C-alpha cells in the first residue's frame, strides 16, 4: 500500500507499478519518498511476472463501523511463478533490506522459528503477547503502548511494566525502561509535565521492582530520581497546572486539558476534565511519599526524612476532608473550588490497592462494595456507573462518540490490578478462587478480535464485546 498507517490508498497516476530485478526476486517502490521494498524467495529459478494493476474497492467493515473511510485501492506490481515438488517448501521474504542470498532467507526464517513461543494455553498466549510490547531502541528497551496506533507512553508503560517485564523474568530490561523514564523525570519533558499522575506511577512500579531486586538496589539506582520527582510537585517543577498545595494534596487543573488518564478530548474540550484534586492522583502521591520515606529511613537519608516526615499525616487529613461525600461510603472522584464530584468511577479503587493507602480497612471494604455494585463486569471495571445519566453502554459510532463512551461507561482491564490487590489485601488467600474466576473470563478473547491478545476495552453492557 505504501501509505501511512492511518490513511487508505486510492488509485492514482502517481504510483509507480514498475519492478526491478534483483537476485532472487525484485524490488519496487510505489512513490519516490518511500524506501525500496525487496521481494525475494529462497528457491532458485523462481520467476517474477511483471503485471502492474490496480485492484479497487477493498472493504474494511470494522473501519466503516468505527466511522472511518473503509474502502481502499491497492496496486500490485506482479506475481511469482515456480514449480514445487510434493513436500517441497518455499520461503518468501518481503523486507526493506535486500537478502544477500537464498541461504540468508533460510537462516532468518530458521532463527524466527527458534524464537517463537509455544502458544498452547491462555497463559502462554499472554506471555507471548507481553513479549511483543517490549522492543529495542537505541539506548535500551522500550514499551510500545498499543498496536498499531501509538509509540511509547510513559503512564501506560509504568502501569504495564510489572506484567510485561518483571513477571517474565526480564528484570534488566525493566530497569532499562525505568532508566529512560527516570531521565525524563529529571529533565522534566513535556510528555511528563502533561500527565499529573505519571511520575507517581514510577513509584508504584519501583515497588514491584523491589520484590525482584531488593530495596537497596532500588534506592541506590533511583533514590535521587524519587526525591527529585516529589520535590517537583512541591516546588512547582511540574508547571503551574500541577503542584502540591499547602494542605499536602496534589492539584491538577488546566482549562480543557485533561491531566489524568481519562484524557479524551472532543472538539477541543476534555470529555472528563476532573480538574482539581483527583482521587487516584492523590492516592498515588501519598503512596509515593510514604514509600520514599520508608527507603530514606532504611538507608539513612536523614535530610529527606526530616523534610518530609510530617507530610503523610497532613495529606491523610486533607484527603479525608476534601474527598468526603455526605451520605456516601466512597470518596469523591475529584474535588475543586466548586464541586465535590460524586461520580462512581474506577479511580477510587486505586486508593484501595496500593502499598500505602489513606483508607482504613472498613473504608476499603465500602469502596470495593461500591465497585462491585456499579462497575465490576466479567471483563474489568466500567469507567462510569450505569446509574449515571452520562453512561454509555456501547463503545460505537463516530470517533467522537467512541471517545465519549470510552471514559463514560466502557470497561477497562487495567484497574482490575488494584481491585484484585485490594481484595487480597483484605481477604488474603481466601480470594484466590475468585481471582482465578476473574481471569478465566478472558480466555475466550484470546481466539477472537486481537488474536492471541486481549482487547484494551470492552462494551459496558452485556455481552461485554
Model feature map: region roles:
Residues 1-465:
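Acidic, mature catalytic/reactive cores of soluble proteins
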